[in-house]
Amino acid sequence: PQFRSSAASDVYKRQTQQSKNSNVSSALDTSHLKVKFPFKAKYGNFINGKFVEPKSGKYFDNVSPINNEKICSVARSNEKDVEAALDAAHAAFVEWGKTDITTRSNILYKIADVLEKNLNLLATAECLDNGKPIRECMAADLPLVIDHWRYFAGVIRAEEGSVAEISNSQYSYNIPEPLGVVGQIVPWNFPLLMATWKLAPALAAGNC
């Protein structure tokens, strides 16, 4: 992989449109990955299965740390957006919390399959957004993301309740139950992997 900072030559910055079409960014050579630019021009908040405008109507620039290129605009959210997301999660939990373990496991496996199918694209997006080497995204971050989804898809199948005899007239039993709606703040170290660390086990356990 090749990286060029904001100090790249003017000649490189004025590369032809044909050359630009072979790469997703002037800072990153991804021609060998055969992927298109992974971002749309603007993103709202993903709530209840679709992108929606932020309540404030405001957006901010998402800039790649590789060379300070703007890669897209992102919703500037506030507490009203959080409330909307919480409402959607509580509504989804009514059904998801009652979904049987086999179904939850199969859905997690499908998520892993989709991630694996789009590994090159997601690794490119992670690299541009995060600034880390594309080879690290390709060889470490994304494979670990996929593996975590499959791991928890398997683990949940082995989760069972238990009964313990305390005395000849007393028994103790436990039944795993989802907590409900949970939240997560994702730092910038490796966003997709850190999100997966929390999302996969939470969804596997029936939380939203």
Predicted regions and their residues:
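Residue-level signature of catalytic and energy-coupling elements of molecular machines
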Residues: 49, 68, 104, 149, ...
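Short Gly/Pro-enriched turn/cap motifs at secondary-structure boundaries
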Residues: 2, 51, 173-174
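Hydrophobic face of amphipathic alpha-helices that form TPR/SEL1-like repeat modules
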Residues: 13-66
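Single conserved hydrophobic/aromatic residue that forms the stacking wall/gate
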Residues: 1-12
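Glycine-rich loop-to-alpha-helix module at the N-terminal edge of alpha/beta enzyme cores
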Residues: 69-159, 169
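Conserved small-residue-rich beta-alpha loop and adjacent elements
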Residues: 162-208
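Conserved strand-loop elements at the edges of beta-sheets that form or border functional pockets
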Residues: 5, 54, 64, 76, ...
